[in-house]
Amino acid sequence: MSMLCYTLIIAFLIGIWAAPQSEDNVPLGSPATSDLSDTSCAQTHEGLKTSRNTDQRHPAPKKVDDQEPGSVANIIVDPKLFQKRQFQSSRVLFSTQPPPLSRDEQSVEFLNNEDALNRNIQAKRQNHPVHDLGEHSVCDSISEWVTKTTATDIKGNTVTVEVDVNLNNEVYKQYFFETKCRNPNPVPSGCRGIDSRLWNSYCTTTQTFVKALTMEGNQASWRFIRIDTACVCVITKKTDNL
């Protein structure tokens, strides 16, 4: 009888030793706990992969701030920057589309309240009365609204000029009204109406400085840049007549 009891006890102990330990009885830091952590990490990683795949199938719309550099065609400008704008020129204009060159063109949306003044100036430049009176200009010029990506500032440095500006979720372009010579020699002798027997002459484009929105590092700032503004006649006295 005692042998049978010993046999049963030994079999019971062997069974307990051979049975896998339950997770509830595993001490902290044991291999079973490590396996459980690995399992949880694997499940979490699998969940992240599933979520990432779902996001790839249904990508969320990008915000302006989240887009890669170079993928955004315009910069977002603080409206306070325009409140600090000084020395405004009628030759610099922020508009949603190319400004009209004549009074008959359809009106467009301007950034400031000087649209009427700008349109009047444009009309006067386009419809100058001298040709209607039989008068002729010494030099022929052409005027048009243009955009710029680079320019020379007042210090002689090449700077980056902003083309597209995002202000209050509205995209404006920065336009410059430039005037330049159509031809350096409107007549074979140079400038029109100049006595070529006494004078050498030619037409040349002159420039002036206007305040424009430029990029300085990663910030937008106002800076004086040079643009073409007029076509003038340059004359020099012929040396053989001295």
UniProtKB/Swiss-Prot annotation:
GO cellular component: axon; dendrite; extracellular space; synaptic vesicle
Example of a GO MF term: lipid binding
Tissues where this protein is expressed: Expressed by the venom gland.
Compartmental location: Secreted
Domain of life: Eukaryota
Keyword Heme found: no
Signal peptide: 1-18
Region annotation (Disordered) ranges: 45-69
Residue span(s) of the pro-peptide: 19-125
Keyword Signal set for record: yes
GO biological process: cell surface receptor protein tyrosine kinase signaling pathway; modulation of chemical synaptic transmission; negative regulation of neuron apoptotic process; nerve development; nerve growth factor signaling pathway; neuron projection morphogenesis
SMART domains documented for this protein: NGF
InterPro entries: Cystine-knot_cytokine, Nerve_growth_factor-like, Nerve_growth_factor-rel, Nerve_growth_factor_bsu, Nerve_growth_factor_CS, Venom_nerve_growth_factor
Disulfide bonds: 139-203, 181-231, 191-233
UniProt KW keywords: Cleavage on pair of basic residues, Disulfide bond, Growth factor, Lipid-binding, Metalloenzyme inhibitor, Metalloprotease inhibitor, Protease inhibitor, Secreted, Signal, Toxin
Basic and acidic residues: bias regions: 46-66
Known partners and oligomeric status: Homodimer; non-covalently linked.
Stated role: Nerve growth factor is important for the development and maintenance of the sympathetic and sensory nervous systems. It stimulates division and differentiation of sympathetic and embryonic sensory neurons as well as basal forebrain cholinergic neurons in the brain. Its relevance in the snake venom is not clear. However, it has been shown to inhibit metalloproteinase-dependent proteolysis of platelet glycoprotein Ib alpha, suggesting a metalloproteinase inhibition to prevent metalloprotease autodigestion and/or protection against prey proteases.
Family to which this protein belongs: Belongs to the NGF-beta family.
Name of the protein in question: Venom nerve growth factor 3
Organism per entry: Pseudechis australis
